[in-house]
Amino acid sequence: MSQSTPYFRPSTHAQGLANYPHARTVRSPDGKGAYIYVSGTSSRRGDGTFVGATSNSNGTTTLDIRQQTAAVLSNIDEIIQGASNGRASIRDVVDATVFLTNMKDDYSGMNAEWNQIWSDRNTAPARTTVEVRALPRDEIIVEIKCTAYYV
């Protein structure tokens, strides 16, 4: 089935570390709408650098959950808009899974940025947040995968 469903892989975004698209679109059973399944998205830029990861002169890296979350949400919005030819946006997300590497330190900062997009819980998507041991790169402290629906 996945070979026959449209995929979206913007050339300006960072490409996945394995062979998968940024999103895949599936028409709804009634044919009137479509679901966009967005792959796990980080703050990685097209040039391979990361928003919210600053290298320090002593060799350490400062990681900022708010900057990373804002960048992730912006990247997701661009992916959804591209996959839908501008007919949908991040506001059409109906379900999301948030992966954090440090729930204790980063949950409130991630929520602060999340609430910038969805200030009303009645219009926010269903969401699950889980702590994971690691994400693909040490510079990544938040990753979000989601599903959007539009008509």
Regions found by a protein language model. Give the residues of each.
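N-terminal presequence-like segments and the immediate start of the first folded domain
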Residues: M1-S74, E78-V94, L100-V151
